[in-house]
Amino acid sequence: MAKLKITLRKSAAHRLPEQRKMVKEFGLNRVNSSVIKPDDAATRGVIFKLAHLVTVEEIKD
């Protein structure tokens, strides 16, 4: 299964509380921090909500 590298590009400060919570639960602590997550529907849903804050790269296994 493919994986996604998600990088926080903009700060979550001054965003909606729901968006700040999603960023924190995703494991993104600071700007330019990255996490690798599986490419599934739940991950894609969070990325859709945070599209203006993150960049996504696909990693092939």
UniProtKB/Swiss-Prot annotation:
Keywords: Ribonucleoprotein, Ribosomal protein. GO terms for cellular component: large ribosomal subunit. CDD domains: Ribosomal_L30_like. Pfam families: Ribosomal_L30. The keyword ATP-binding does not apply. GO terms for molecular function: structural constituent of ribosome. InterPro entries: Ribo_uL30_ferredoxin-like_sf, Ribosomal_uL30_bac-type, Ribosomal_uL30_ferredoxin-like. One of its GO terms (biological process) is translation. It comes from the Bacteria. HAMAP family: Ribosomal_uL30_B (MF_01371_B). Part of the 50S ribosomal subunit. NCBIfam families: rpmD_bact. Belongs to the universal ribosomal protein uL30 family. This is Large ribosomal subunit protein uL30. It comes from Latilactobacillus sakei subsp. sakei (strain 23K) (Lactobacillus sakei subsp. sakei). The gene is rpmD.
